[in-house]
């Protein structure tokens, strides 16, 4: 049964909230929270973050004239309540589904999403851009950026704040302090904000205010409580933010609608310099299972609303992430120089398991990929064996450091690139599409693409053994294929692939976990009387040139298959073949890559089918290369 939401049913846009009383806003927040819980229970997605900002979301849309006033959410995974209030409630149960709403803010989706997001710490920079454009054109609309305490561990947030005072006189930054990003926030800024909230001045003021107000007649007690809320900023300070040129207001209770509305109304009037409003919230607020286990309810699959039990299917094989963590532990037990680095994603990268075994050799640097990479470079320069486990999409944030601090110096940093390829429901912002290209372009870099769990174990062993240059290995989200993993895998011979199946007419050269689909394609071609060789490249750099030349020499057509963008493995293969004159005799070649678009969210298998990277797509490419009618093969390449 859907929740009963009589007040929310009357709200079709934020304008409908602006005539509501504080009591009605509280009721609306309760109904938005119930609607969010019910919707996410059916779709899965990010739950805890959105529940923590329900009151803040309602208050912001009540006080500010969105979409005229610009409201930018950092990261965006907390924006489900925002979507419910901004005309998308009728589609909220399509979140993260094919053809449905994005799980993040998205410009193409609504005028209420002026700036898309999914990566951390972009909001203040984007907001400053809106401020500068507004100021130049003489408009008077307001600009607000909402950023979490976890994102405040990213340097980009401070780059923007450092630039704010000299850029504009009107910007409101809402610091949503829930003391919980995905993992607990780390570093000096997290400790600083904790001191603000727990400081003696703040606590003394609260206690004094409560004691004094109790002596007042009842009608004055509420007024005294409001005065106490407004005065907090004057007592607690917020010196760091003030030194950056901001007014500092807070900390205030992010679930107190009355306080939120009044503070935001005052903040909206400030137009002589930027203001930071420090709001303290609880992740998962209002849903007991999420309050008790915020880390377990950051991102969820479908779940039972009553019990909170998530409908997780029994895995047929361990995830690639878990295999990585287990294998790294094995090597760390044998080599005390092995250390691990994560950028605020210990559970997502599996390094929570490594950290349980080797806490003193595990470094969580916060949402700071640039720092993570150069920190790893420093470790490597002094003889350690660092493994930087970073999602492919987030490694993009530290690419200059990969080039300048690691590759140019030939430092043996090992990059464990998780979430390679398509990631399904998280869509284009989280797809691992580009790492093969941008890593493979670097002189001296070793780039591996394991085909299964056992090959991943061998790639890790290879990275441990490489001590004179950087290396990287990529692996996807989700379960492996169920192959047996050796007790301790042997390293691979660098730059050597393998023949998995011998054939004659066409060669299929796979890089990464499309090997299974390549073998299926070979079976389908065999059913049509076409013999296919299937090879596993193992390395995108250095390429196995001997294998390439053999495949080119012995087959009429060559098909390369990869889970990456144009300009990656297939491009490297073409370059190598051209350099060796292997294209001169008329070899028919097709390079199968992800399409040259940003694919919207869907089930991964549907996305790979759209890309032509499933068995049927590989068969179509092979038949086309050979000039054979493929009308009997279902589907088409997108």
Curated annotation (Swiss-Prot):
Substrates-to-products reaction catalysed: D-glyceraldehyde 3-phosphate + pyruvate + H(+) = 1-deoxy-D-xylulose 5-phosphate + CO2
Keywords on record: Isoprene biosynthesis, Magnesium, Metal-binding, Thiamine biosynthesis, Thiamine pyrophosphate, Transferase
Top EC category: transferase
Required cofactor names: Mg(2+); thiamine diphosphate
Note on how the cofactor is bound: Binds 1 Mg(2+) ion per subunit. Binds 1 thiamine pyrophosphate per subunit.
UniProt binding sites for Mg(2+): 149, 178
InterPro entries recorded: Dxylulose-5-P_synthase (IPR005477), THDP-binding (IPR029061), Transketo_C/PFOR_II (IPR009014), Transketolase-like_Pyr-bd (IPR005475), Transketolase_BS (IPR020826), Transketolase_C (IPR033248), Transketolase_CS (IPR049557)
Pfam families in the cross-refs: DXP_synthase_N, Transket_pyr, Transketolase_C
Top-rank taxon: Bacteria
Pathway the protein takes part in: Metabolic intermediate biosynthesis; 1-deoxy-D-xylulose 5-phosphate biosynthesis; 1-deoxy-D-xylulose 5-phosphate from D-glyceraldehyde 3-phosphate and pyruvate: step 1/1
Binding site for thiamine diphosphate: 77, 118-120, 150-151, 178, 287, 369
Keyword Transferase: yes
GO terms, biological process: 1-deoxy-D-xylulose 5-phosphate biosynthetic process; glyceraldehyde-3-phosphate metabolic process; terpenoid biosynthetic process; thiamine biosynthetic process
CDD domains listed in its UniProt record: TPP_DXS, TPP_PYR_DXS_TK_like
Keyword Chaperone: no
EC code: 2.2.1.7
Gene3D superfamilies on file: 3.40.50.920, 3.40.50.970
One example GO MF annotation: 1-deoxy-D-xylulose-5-phosphate synthase activity
Entry similarity comment: Belongs to the transketolase family. DXPS subfamily.
Cross-referenced PANTHER family: 1-D-DEOXYXYLULOSE 5-PHOSPHATE SYNTHASE-RELATED (PTHR43322), 1-DEOXY-D-XYLULOSE-5-PHOSPHATE SYNTHASE, CHLOROPLASTIC (PTHR43322:SF5)
Protein purpose: Catalyzes the acyloin condensation reaction between C atoms 2 and 3 of pyruvate and glyceraldehyde 3-phosphate to yield 1-deoxy-D-xylulose-5-phosphate (DXP).
Assembly and oligomerization: Homodimer.
Full protein name: 1-deoxy-D-xylulose-5-phosphate synthase
Lineage of the organism: Bacteria, Pseudomonadati, Pseudomonadota, Alphaproteobacteria, Caulobacterales
């Amino acid at each position: 049964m859907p929740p009963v939401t009589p007040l929310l049913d009357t709200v079709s846009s934020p304008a409908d909230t602006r005539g509501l009383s504080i009591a009605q806003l509280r009721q609306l927040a309760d109904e938005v929270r119930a609607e969010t819980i019910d919707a996410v229970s059916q779709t899965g997605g990010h739950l805890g973050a959105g529940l923590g900002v329900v009151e803040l979301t309602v208050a912001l849309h009540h006080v500010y004239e969105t979409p005229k006033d610009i409201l930018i959410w950092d990261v965006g995974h907390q924006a489900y309540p925002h979507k419910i209030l901004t005309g998308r409630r009728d589609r909220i149960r399509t979140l993260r589904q094919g053809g449905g709403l994005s799980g993040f803010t998205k410009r193409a989706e609504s005028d209420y999403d002026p700036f898309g997001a999914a990566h951390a710490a972009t909001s203040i920079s984007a907001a400053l851009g809106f401020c500068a454009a507004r100021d130049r054109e003489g408009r008077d609309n307001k600009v607000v950026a909402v950023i979490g305490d976890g994102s405040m561990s990213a340097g980009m947030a401070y780059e923007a704040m450092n630039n704010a005072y000299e850029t504009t006189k009107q910007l409101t930054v809402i610091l949503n302090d829930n003391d919980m990003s995905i993992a607990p926030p780390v570093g000096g800024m997290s400790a600083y904000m904790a001191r603000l909230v727990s400081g003696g001045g703040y606590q003394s003021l609260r206690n004094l205010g409560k004691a004094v107000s109790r002596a007042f007649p009842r009608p004055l007690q509420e007024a005294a409580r409001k005065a106490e809320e407004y005065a907090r900023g004057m007592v607690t300070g917020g010196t760091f933010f003030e030194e950056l040129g901001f007014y500092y207001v807070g900390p205030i209770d992010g679930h107190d609608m009355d306080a939120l509305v009044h503070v935001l109304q005052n903040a909206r009037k400030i137009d002589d310099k930027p203001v930071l409003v420090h709001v303290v919230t609880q992740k998962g607020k209002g849903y007991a299972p999420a309050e008790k286990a915020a880390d377990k309810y950051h991102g969820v699959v479908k779940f039972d609303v009553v019990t909170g039990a998530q409908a997780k299917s029994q895995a047929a094989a361990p995830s690639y992430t878990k295999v990585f963590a287990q294998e790294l532990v094995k090597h760390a037990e044998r080599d005390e120089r092995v250390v691990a680095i994560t950028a605020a994603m210990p559970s997502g990268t599996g390094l929570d398991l490594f950290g349980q075994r080797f806490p003193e050799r595990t470094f969580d640097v916060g949402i700071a990929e640039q720092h993570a990479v150069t920190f790893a470079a420093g470790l490597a320069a002094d003889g350690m064996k660092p493994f930087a486990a970073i999602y492919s999409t987030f490694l993009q944030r530290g690419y200059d450091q990969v080039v300048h601090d690691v590759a140019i110096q030939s430092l043996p940093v090992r990059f464990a690139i998780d979430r390679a390829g398509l990631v399904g429901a998280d869509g284009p912002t989280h797809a691992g599409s580009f790492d093969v290209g941008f890593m493979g372009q670097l002189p001296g870099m070793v780039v591996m693409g394991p085909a299964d769990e056992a090959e991943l174990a061998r790639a890790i062993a290879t990275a441990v053994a490489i001590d004179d240059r950087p290396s990287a290995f990529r692996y996807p989200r989700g379960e492996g294929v169920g192959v047996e993993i050796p007790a301790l895998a042997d390293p691979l011979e660098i730059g050597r692939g393998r023949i998995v199946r011998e054939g004659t007419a066409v060669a299929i050269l796979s890089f990464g976990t499309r090997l299974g689909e390549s073998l299926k394609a070979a079976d389908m071609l065999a059913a049509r009387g076409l013999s296919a060789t299937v090879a596993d490249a193992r390395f995108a750099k250095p390429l196995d040139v001997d294998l390439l030349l053999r495949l080119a020499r012995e087959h009429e057509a060559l098909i390369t298959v990869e889970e990456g963008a144009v300009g990656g493995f297939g491009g490297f293969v073409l370059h190598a073949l051209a350099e060796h004159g292997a294209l001169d005799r008329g070899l028919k070649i097709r390079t199968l890559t992800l399409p040259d678009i940003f694919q919207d969210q869907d089930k991964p298998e549907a996305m790979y089918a759209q890309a032509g990277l499933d068995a049927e797509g590989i068969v179509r490419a092979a038949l086309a290369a050979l000039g054979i009618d493929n009308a009997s093969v279902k589907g088409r390449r997108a």
